[in-house]
């Protein structure tokens, strides 16, 4: 999901979540502080917080910072029976949604590895790079995750299964595209 809420790449595996999941996710994340205050004022529990968002760099992917209580959405949360798990890397959200009960740490690690592999292949992880390498990104996702079950997430192991060449996007070009 792009910083404006646009879906860049979408792959459904189990079809157990609503079609408009990206819109719901982006609205929840963007207005997390307001949603949290509304839930507290109403006395309801519209979402269960599973963990605290951590945007520290992992394996060179991610935005530095984090650690402050700024009402940002946690990395994993539940809303109306749908589990939303995400990592944010260079302004791009890598998101997983499911109704199944799954280990948040396992899914978050998978999302970090997906972000790292895309960065390894494209040179940078940005909205522009993912858009220009959409076919390559779909091919990577198909090799890394099969019917919702993670397979290989190693860049070296994927090299013999990936046949598309990346369209190289310079970091200065992708930075201008983010403006």
Predicted regions and their residues:
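Acidic, low-complexity cytosolic segments
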Residues: 1-179
């Amino acid at each position: 999901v792009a910083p404006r809420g646009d879906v860049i790449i979408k792959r459904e595996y189990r079809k157990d979540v609503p079609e408009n999941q990206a819109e719901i996710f982006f609205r929840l994340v963007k207005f997390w502080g307001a949603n949290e205050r509304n839930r507290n004022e109403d006395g309801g529990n519209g979402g269960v917080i599973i963990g605290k968002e951590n945007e520290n760099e992992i394996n060179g992917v991610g935005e530095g910072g984090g650690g402050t209580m700024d009402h940002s959405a946690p990395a994993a949360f539940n809303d109306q029976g749908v589990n939303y798990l995400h990592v944010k890397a260079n302004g791009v959200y890598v998101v997983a949604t499911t109704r199944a009960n799954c280990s948040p740490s396992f899914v978050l690690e998978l999302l970090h590895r997906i972000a790292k592999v895309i960065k390894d292949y494209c040179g940078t992880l940005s909205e522009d790079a993912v858009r220009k390498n959409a076919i390559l990104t779909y091919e990577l996702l198909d090799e890394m995750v099969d019917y919702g079950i993670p397979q290989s997430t190693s860049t070296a192991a994927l090299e013999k299964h990936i046949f598309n060449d990346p369209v190289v996007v310079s970091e200065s070009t992708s930075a201008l595209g983010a403006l």
